[in-house]
């Protein structure tokens, strides 16, 4: 399981160190794609296969399902760690997530998210005010 928040920087070549705690579970190869809330989602290969299976079951006759699947898969790329535990983030994904130098790598149960530090701080400020209300809504999901 992925959890925690780690602050890192992207170097001039677009490389990012993946936190040591995440490396073993991610494996040598994994998939990065456009996530929600303008962050990047990172899935281990098994997690990606499970997500792919779920998305394949969506009805292709629905325009919203087609649009989501198209967007999700078009941004996906298979990545590999180098010997220093870094990945090269493709320019299109850095642009999508508005990543510059400072980023936050967040563990979210079955996936890792990569956020621009400023966007993450803004998201946390917005969400912290709603945390209790969100917790109350989780009752509907039997949590």
Curated annotation (Swiss-Prot):
Subcellular localization(s) per the UniProt record: Cytoplasm, Nucleoid
GO molecular function: DNA-binding transcription factor activity; transcription cis-regulatory region binding
Pfam families for this protein: MraZ
Domain SpoVT-AbrB: 5-47, 76-119
GO CC, any one term: nucleoid
Database matches in InterPro entries: MraZ (IPR003444), MraZ_C (IPR035644), MraZ_dom (IPR020603), MraZ_N (IPR035642), MraZ_sf (IPR038619), SpoVT-AbrB_dom (IPR007159), SpoVT-AbrB_sf (IPR037914)
Gene3D superfamilies for the chain: Transcriptional regulator MraZ domain
GO biological process: negative regulation of DNA-templated transcription initiation
Record keyword rRNA-binding present: no
Keywords: Cytoplasm, DNA-binding, Repeat, Transcription, Transcription regulation
Matching HAMAP family: MraZ (MF_01008)
Oligomer status and interactors: Forms oligomers.
NCBIfam families: division/cell wall cluster transcriptional repressor MraZ (TIGR00242)
Family per record: Belongs to the MraZ family.
Protein name: Transcriptional regulator MraZ
Organism annotation: Moorella thermoacetica (strain ATCC 39073 / JCM 9320)
């Amino acid at each position: 399981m992925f959890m925690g928040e780690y602050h890192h920087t992207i170097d001039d070549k677009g490389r990012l160190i993946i936190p040591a705690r995440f490396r073993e579970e991610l494996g040598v190869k994994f998939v990065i794609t456009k996530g929600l809330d303008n962050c990047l989602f990172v899935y281990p290969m098994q997690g990606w296969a499970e997500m792919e299976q779920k998305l394949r079951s969506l009805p292709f006759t629905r325009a919203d399902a087609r649009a989501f699947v198209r967007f999700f898969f078009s941004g996906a790329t298979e990545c590999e760690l180098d010997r220093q535990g870094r990945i090269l983030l493709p320019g299109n994904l850095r642009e999508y997530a508005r990543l510059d130098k400072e980023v936050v790598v967040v563990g979210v149960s079955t996936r890792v998210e990569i956020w621009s530090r400023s966007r993450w701080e803004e998201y946390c400020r917005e969400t912290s005010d709603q945390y209790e209300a969100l917790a109350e809504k989780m009752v509907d999901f039997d949590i």
